[in-house]
From Swiss-Prot:
Taxonomic lineage: Bacteria, Bacillati, Actinomycetota, Actinomycetes, Mycobacteriales
Presence of the UniProt keyword Lyase in the record: yes
Residues noted as binding [4Fe-4S] cluster in the record, renumbered to the chain: C479, C545, C548
Cofactor mode of binding and number, as noted: Binds 1 [4Fe-4S] cluster per subunit.
Reaction equation(s) it catalyzes: citrate = D-threo-isocitrate; (2S,3R)-3-hydroxybutane-1,2,3-tricarboxylate = 2-methyl-cis-aconitate + H2O
Name of encoding gene: acn
Stated name of the protein: Aconitate hydratase A
Gene3D superfamilies, sorted: 6.10.190.10, Aconitase, domain 3 (3.30.499.10), Aconitase, domain 4 (3.20.19.10)
Superkingdom of the source species: Bacteria
One of the record's GO molecular function terms: aconitate hydratase activity
InterPro entries: AcnA_IRP_Swivel, Acnase/IPM_dHydase_lsu_aba_1/3, Acoase/IPM_deHydtase_lsu_aba, Aconitase/3IPM_dehydase_swvl, Aconitase/IRP2, Aconitase_4Fe-4S_BS, Aconitase_4Fe-4S_dom, AconitaseA/IPMdHydase_ssu_swvl
Subunit structure: Monomer.
Stated family: Belongs to the aconitase/IPM isomerase family.
UniProt GO cellular component terms: cytosol; extracellular region; peptidoglycan-based cell wall; plasma membrane
Length: 943
């Protein structure tokens, strides 16, 4: 998106590339920009081009040009992303909101067609496919069929959206994973619009949007509310960050993969601490890192904790763009633009960074990470001994939540990251587990291994013994690795070598392969390696996120029963980016991240209790032991196969009709028209009530009087506590709603898949089974006290909220430190508003959730420094009056407001709460009742 800049620095110029001329905004017109890191040059150009004299001023541009690398971030800027990418879980509610805005505009006498993305938006349907079937030739076809049966209603809605909105396109199911499609096709690196050339930048409704950083495209994950606003032309508010320079030297050694490098970098950056910072790779070693490896590193930025992890543009970028079928004209523009703007990587020029780290790639060794955090790297040589130490925490009463493992908390599922790719099934760490460390369910063998062998008989799989540590899932999955031909063909060559030596996968291993792009299928075909993968059980199950986000599908019944009946701690090995406990499969406690070749190696081994150095994987036909080193492909073999099997034509052919879809997609009955015909019986897509009763001009904001406390919460309440993504529990308000609408229990699906239906989502707000509402003693889950009833009895939070609404009683929520940490799940703010909550008062807020609350018209207030609900003597039974909010009507933002709590006996407690509306823009959003109302009124004003 481009706009007419005020051009304070006279930066507007022309760039000629071949026969074409483009308008650009030259960075060298602004003093001091040459010393900036690449990532900040991208931000500086963004401000220069979008300077409007109010939101973005000359002072903002000078602030970034004169950036002090050592200072703590304090200067807020308005960043305007060039485009938006989405996946279907988070994208559906965005399009629901846009459809609702169209109707609201029409109701207010405006033109509904004015509600259109101003920044191009692409949605890739990749989060819904589940690996239900596996290990058979028709697995892909059947899984897609089941996917359409489950999600047809949502897909019809997205097809309508594609036709109704300009600049909004949908990549249909069974095509690929959003981030891989982004690097292979959607990303242009330099964009052009209205004759202006500028850096490609994006925000996405998924944390791993950062994969595109590998191409030199600045992008990261945001919440749905921010993504919608960005689509409608609103800038993203951010602080100019600290930038960590990560110098790469040396070369990767034989036998080491890009996965090993990224797990090593994850461990280093987690230990260093990069939350809220940009990471930028630089140095002479950058040229040695292939683009696919760069994308793998960028992808795991959320696991590092950083906002972005970017590589600058260089010859390798150009080579990749050419290789993936970008036009010669586009490739020439990228090179010319990068060189003209000082954005071309010069290994001899060292920019200024806030902090410095270095990795010699020759020091990296084969590695895995687990059993429950991506940063917990284990050298493959130590994998068996480490597993034997870890297993004690997972059997009997030796639990991962026991005192010697302080890390396992629910918060970890989304710890310090941008919005997560939501898992299909989540099980949560129990805060109440016994701490007796005696192992009751296992016999400790003489060699130190914890063991509980269980004999399993299966008509289909035969007879075998399962024990703790058995690998029951081996999944080549996730855009993190399936975008990388080196590891994907490395895995296939390892499979070939294994089959030729007579090795087979163990019968209890669920083996799946789900690439992020159809190009992988092509090069497996062309190289003739598919049959070897299939011989080991690795059949194609889908093109989508599958196991990486918890859509691993059920384990075979006999295996699941043996695991649960005998409390076995079994394992999954996957080539994904997250391995939090309970994320991959409800039956699996221990999850390990590994490269695709190692996924196959563990399928052959069948257990984590295995030392590849000393233990053979089996015997060849001559009875000779076969070790992993005997079947590991040489670097030459991998390179030769890549050269012979992959070409540009594969990319151009696969992406020629990327938006077309298969017959199922094309034959979906799809409504037409510029406004959506809502189905009153739908349980997936419903019109939300955000704009009901909205007027063309905002009503004055009011103080809050007579409020009751809906929830009194402690520290580190995450957005997953507030709005869970996983399974819907029978008997809860959300389940009751689905029951009443004729939905069978087996078809409840997850909260994540039902985000287009506010009725389900309101009932799921504050409904996490691990939530502790301190209004109640020793109760966890979505419960509160309902003070509309005599004695304030226990009730579901949703039911109590309905009773309060019926009596026009406003609500407040109290929180501790780090309220709203974790994923920037927009439904955590939407659900809070729709329950009738007017204010959240906490000791501190996570940045994105705080801004999301304002974006929904809920005021975030902070206790005075050092104070909390308990230190002030509040127990949540009081009635609250909050005054001073109405000062906002005078165009000012109050620093504090007065909170008065009246106890049952008439005694009062007063304190001044800090108003956490931090910018003038946020004040405008709050005055309008939210960011979408603000945008909608601006559209109305513009005629």
């Amino acid at each position: 998106m481009t706009s007419k800049s005020v051009n304070s620095f006279g930066a507007h110029d022309t760039l000629k590339v071949g026969e074409k001329s483009y308008q650009i905004y030259r960075l060298d017109a602004v003093p001091n920009t040459a010393k900036l890191p690449y990532s900040l040059k991208v931000l500086a150009e963004n401000l220069l081009r979008n300077e409007d004299g109010s939101n973005i001023t000359k002072d903002h541009i000078e602030a970034i040009a004169n950036w002090d690398p050592k200072a703590e971030p304090s200067i807020e800027i308005q960043y305007t992303p060039a485009r938006v990418v989405m996946q279907d879980f988070t994208g559906v509610p965005c399009i629901v909101d846009l459809a609702t805005m169209r109707e609201a505009i029409a109701d207010l006498g405006g033109n509904p067609d004015k509600v259109n993305p101003l920044a191009p938006a692409d949605l890739v349907i990749d989060h819904s496919v589940i690996a239900d079937l596996f290990g058979r030739a028709d697995a892909f076809e059947r899984n897609v069929e089941i996917e359409y049966q489950r999600n047809g209603e949502r897909y019809q809605f997205l097809r309508w959206g594609q036709g109704a909105f300009d600049d909004f396109k949908v990549v249909p199911p069974g095509t690929g994973i959003v981030h891989q499609v982004n690097i292979e096709y959607l990303a242009s690196v330099v964009m052009t619009r209205d004759g202006v050339a500028y850096p490609d930048t994006c925000v996405g409704t998924d944390s791993h949007t950062t994969m595109v950083n590998g191409l030199g495209v600045l992008g990261w994950g945001v919440g749905g509310i921010e993504a919608e606003a960005a689509m409608l032309g609103q800038p993203v508010s951010m602080l100019i960050p600290r930038v960590v320079g990560f110098r790469l030297t040396g070369e990767i050694q034989p036998g080491v993969t890009a996965t090993d490098v990224v797990l090593t970098v994850t461990e280093m950056l987690r230990q260093h601490g990069v939350v809220g910072k940009f990471v930028e790779f630089y140095g002479e070693g950058v040229a040695e890192v292939p683009l696919a490896n760069r994308a793998t590193l960028g992808n795991m930025s959320p696991e590092f904790g950083s906002t972005a992890a970017i590589f600058p543009i260089d010859e390798e970028t150009i080579k990749y763009l050419r290789f993936t079928g970008r036009t010669p004209e586009q490739v020439a523009l990228v090179e010319a633009y990068a060189k003209a703007q000082g954005m071309w990587h010069d290994p001899k020029h060292e920019p200024e960074f806030s902090e410095y780290l270095e990795l010699n790639l020759s020091d990296v060794v084969p590695s895995i990470a687990g059993p429950k955090r991506p940063q917990d790297r284990i050298a493959l040589a130590q994998a068996k001994s480490t597993f034997r130490e870890q297993i004690y925490h997972y059997v009997g009463n030796g639990s991962p939540d026991s005192p010697h493992d302080p890390h396992s908390k629910l918060d970890e599922v989304v710890e310090e990251t941008f919005p997560a790719s939501d898992p299909g099934q989540l099980t949560f760490a129990n805060d109440d587990v016994a701490t007796d460390e005696t192992v009751h369910s296992a016999a400790a063998h003489a060699d130190g291994r914890v063991s509980n062998p269980v004999r399993v008989k299966s008509d289909e799989l035969g007879e075998f013994v399962l024990d703790h540590g058995a690998v029951v899932i081996a999944a080549i999955t996730s855009c993190t690795n399936t975008s990388n031909p080196e590891v994907m063909l490395g895995a296939a060559l390892l499979a070939r070598n294994a089959v030729e030596k007579g090795l087979t996968s163990k019968p209890w291993v669920k083996t799946t392969i789900a690439p992020g792009s159809q190009v992988v299928n092509d090069y497996y075909d062309r190289s003739g390696l598919w049959p070897y993968l299939e011989k080991l059980g690795f059949y194609l199950v889908g093109y989508g996120c599958t196991t990486c986000i918890g859509n691993s599908g059920p384990l075979p019944e006999e295996i699941s029963k043996a695991v649960n009946d005998n409390d076995l701690s079994v394992t999954a090995v996957l080539s994904g980016n997250r391995n939090f406990e309970g994320r991959i499969n409800p039956d699996v406690k221990m999850n390990y991240l590994a490269s695709p070749p190692l996924v196959i190696a563990y399928a052959l081994a069948g257990t984590m209790d295995f030392d590849f150095q000393t233990q053979p994987l089996g015997q060849d036909k001559d009875g000779k032991n076969v070790f992993l080193r005997d079947i590991w492909p040489s670097q030459q073999d991998v390179s030769d196969t890549i050269a012979a099997a992959i070409n540009q034509e594969m990319f151009t052919r696969n992406y020629a009709d990327v938006f077309k879809g298969d017959d199922r997609w094309r034959n979906l009955p799809t409504p037409s028209g510029n406004t959506f015909e809502w189905d009153p019986n739908s349980t997936y897509v419903r019109k939300p009530p955000y704009f009901e009763g909205m007027t063309a001009k905002p009503e004055p904001v009011g103080n809050i009087s007579g409020a009751r406390v809906l929830a009194l919460l402690g520290d580190s309440v995450t957005t997953d506590h507030i709005s869970p993504a996983g399974a819907i529990k029978p008997g809860t308000p959300a389940a009751r709603y689905l029951d009443e609408h004729g939905v069978d229990r087996k078809d409840y699906n997850s909260f994540g898949s039902r985000r287009g239906n506010h009725e389900v989502m309101i009932r799921g707000t504050f409904a996490n089974i691990r939530l502790r509402n301190q209004l109640l003693d020793d109760v966890s889950g979505g419960y509160t006290r309902d003070f509309t009833q005599p004695g304030g009895p226990q009730a579901f939070i949703y039911d109590a909220a309905q009773n309060y609404a019926a009596q026009h009683i406003p609500l407040v929520v109290f929180g501790g430190k780090e309220y709203g940490s974790g994923s920037s799940r927009d439904w955590a703010a939407k659900g809070t508003l729709l329950l009738g909550v007017r204010a959240v008062i906490a000791e501190s807020f996570e940045r994105i959730h705080r801004s999301n609350l304002i974006g929904m018209g809920v005021i975030p207030l902070q206790f005075p420094e050092g104070k909390s609900a308990s230190s002030l003597g509040l127990d949540g039974t009081e009635v609250f009056d909050i005054t001073g909010i109405d000062v906002l009507n005078d165009g000012k933002t109050p620093k504090t407001v007065c909170v008065q709590a009246t106890k049952g006996d008439g005694a009062t407690i007063e304190f001044d709460a800090v108003v956490r509306i931090d910018t003038p823009g946020e004040a405008d959003y709050y005055r309008n009742g939210g960011i979408l109302q603000y945008v909608l009124r601006n559209i109305l004003k513009s005629g």
